[in-house]
Design a protein with these regions (language model features):
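Beta-propeller-forming repeat regions
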Residues: 1-166
Length: 166
C-alpha cells in the first residue's frame, strides 16, 4: 500500500450522526477529484441522512496528507446537513479549472467549503452532464428521498433549480 490513514472523522457514538436510526453512521462515499486542477486528490465522505462529512487527501512524498475537512456537525442550520447522497461525483461545475464534489443536494467547492446547497434533503440518485445542450454549462438531475420528495434539474454552477416536480 502507498499509505494509510485513520478514517476521518471517526465513528464515535451513533447518536453523534444526527439520529440513532439504522446505520446512519456507517454510510460512506468516495471519489477522486482534481481539486487543484492538475493532481488527483482522494475525497472520502461519511453520512448523508443527517450529519455529513467529507475529507480530502493529497499524495505528498508517498504519504496521504489532509487537504481539508468538511463537517456539518449536528447543526441542522449548516448547509449540507441532511443534504447528502448515496454517491458522489467530481466535476468542474463553476469553470475555474478545479473540480468540485457533488453529493446530492450539496456541492462542495475545491477548497472544502459549500459552493451551494439545495436544502431538499438526501437524494438517492443523480446524473450530471450537459443535459440541456442549448444552455451553457452543466446540469444536475437529482431524485430526492426526503419530503417533499420529487426530482430537480439544477444549474450545477450555482445550485439554481431550473425545474422541480414533487
Amino acid at each position: 500500500a502507498l499509505d494509510t490513514v485513520n478514517y476521518e472523522p471517526s465513528r464515535g457514538t451513533v447518536s453523534k450522526w444526527g439520529d440513532s436510526y439504522g446505520n446512519r453512521v456507517d454510510r460512506f462515499w468516495g471519489t477522486v477529484a482534481y481539486l487543484d486542477g492538475s493532481k488527483p486528490s482522494v475525497v472520502t465522505g461519511r453520512g448523508y441522512y443527517t450529519r455529513m462529512t467529507a475529507t480530502a487527501y493529497d499524495v505528498v512524498n508517498k504519504k496521504l496528507v489532509k487537504r481539508w475537512a468538511f463537517d456539518t456537525g449536528n447543526d441542522k442550520s449548516v448547509a449540507g446537513y441532511g443534504d447528502g447522497n448515496h454517491n458522489s461525483m467530481a466535476a468542474d461545475v463553476d469553470g475555474d479549472g478545479k473540480q468540485e464534489i457533488i453529493t446530492g443536494s450539496t456541492c462542495i467547492d475545491d477548497n472544502g467549503k459549500v459552493l451551494w446547497c439545495l436544502n431538499k434533503g438526501h437524494g438517492d440518485a443523480m446524473h450530471l452532464g450537459d443535459l440541456l445542450p442549448d444552455r451553457k454549462g452543466l446540469e444536475l438531475w437529482i431524485c430526492h428521498e426526503d419530503k417533499p420528495y420529487g426530482v430537480s434539474l439544477v444549474d450545477a454552477s450555482n445550485g439554481k433549480i431550473l425545474f422541480h416536480k414533487d
